[in-house]
Amino acid sequence: MELPPNPGLVDVQRDALYAYDSEAHKAVVNSRPWTNDHKYFKTVRISSVAMIKMVMHARSGGNLEVMGMMQGYIEGSTMVITDAYRLPVEGTETRVNAQDEANEYMVEYLRLCREENRLENVIGWYHSHPGYGCWLSGIDVGTQSLQQQFNEPFVAVVIDPDRTVSQNKVEIGAFRTIPEGIKPFAATNTTTGDGQSVPLNKVEDFGAHSHRYYALDVEHFKSTLDSKLLETLWNKYWVQTLAQNPLLTNRDYTSSQMVDLGSRISKASKSLEMLSTTGQRGPKSDAVDQNIEKLLSEVKQIAAKERSGLMAAEVKGKVFGCGCRGQAEGVQPEKS
């Protein structure tokens, strides 16, 4: 028996982004406006359903990269992502490889979508970068460039599940590559779009290809039904959310941050030693000074996060009497 529609769960104006117009999409694809402007696409809008699916998939992979596809359509210079699905692929800590099984899965998935009258096409792919930020590696640039040659319009989305948990906000980036023959952008520094540094073992790969792609603005949207469902989930799980201790939830990432920071401090110390021996001042010494300032800033950020986590555990323990302070494995907060 089919239930009657609930007016409170549907808002035509708010839910307009879910109304796919296949003819309008085909018209945009056939006109190919991006061929005249390699930065034609400016924004990616991702539905809450697609966002949750991608973040949960990325988080489930742990230290291994995962990969999936995104469905949606084009609206002017905006790429609208309405849904996403994971792929059965083999991932490592540095790359993810799509095999024949994944290609067969994509074909079958799209066939089933058509049967259910879900006509949105695949317009992008996503994968995870656990702990090292949102950017495209050399392999990612090659994959995205190939897709843009044969499957336009296409966008690459990268999610960092570790930084997502650490910062309590989704760490996500959307990118498109620069076509061959177009003058590339100037190479960027060793920080991601949010200002966080790329780990030392990834800096070379990051710097070697950062001029071959550009970032799009990422926005998200949700339907009336999504809002109701998320409100229901919050009312059900707010206790678990409040009881979580970020120091324990993401301690592996914090440890890796400290190890990487130690390696970079050691490298900076050697550079400073060499400059002290030669006594030279100039652009090289200025770069070393800037690097040391950046390292000090990161040390302060990590220390601040640790202090806030310990303070949160202390407050929970006093308010709820749950012994949250002891959950931090005997780590005591600093006394002022």
UniProtKB/Swiss-Prot annotation:
Subcellular location: Cytoplasm; Nucleus
Motif mapping: JAMM motif: 127-140
Gene3D superfamilies: Cytidine Deaminase, domain 2 (3.40.140.10)
UniProt entry keywords in alphabetical sequence: Cytoplasm, Hydrolase, Metal-binding, Metalloprotease, Nucleus, Protease, Signalosome, Zinc
Ranges where the MPN domain occurs: 44-181
UniProt-annotated binding residues for Zn(2+): 127, 129, 140
Molecular-function annotations in GO: deNEDDylase activity; metal ion binding; metallopeptidase activity
GO biological process terms, semicolon-separated: protein deneddylation; proteolysis; regulation of cell cycle
Enzyme nomenclature, EC number: 3.4.-.-
A UniProt-annotated Pfam family: JAB
Entry function: Catalytic component of the COP9 signalosome (CSN) complex that acts as an regulator of the ubiquitin (Ubl) conjugation pathway by mediating the deneddylation of the cullin subunit of SCF-type E3 ubiquitin-protein ligase complexes. The CSN complex is involved in the regulation of the circadian clock through its control of the stability of the SCF(FWD-1) complex.
Family per record: Belongs to the peptidase M67A family. CSN5 subfamily.
Subunit structure: Component of the COP9 signalosome (CSN) complex.
Notes concerning its domains: The JAMM motif is essential for the protease activity of the CSN complex resulting in deneddylation of cullins. It constitutes the catalytic center of the complex.
PANTHER family: EUKARYOTIC TRANSLATION INITIATION FACTOR 3 -RELATED (PTHR10410)
Name of the protein described by the UniProt record: COP9 signalosome complex subunit 5
Organism expressing this protein natively: Neurospora crassa (strain ATCC 24698 / 74-OR23-1A / CBS 708.71 / DSM 1257 / FGSC 987)
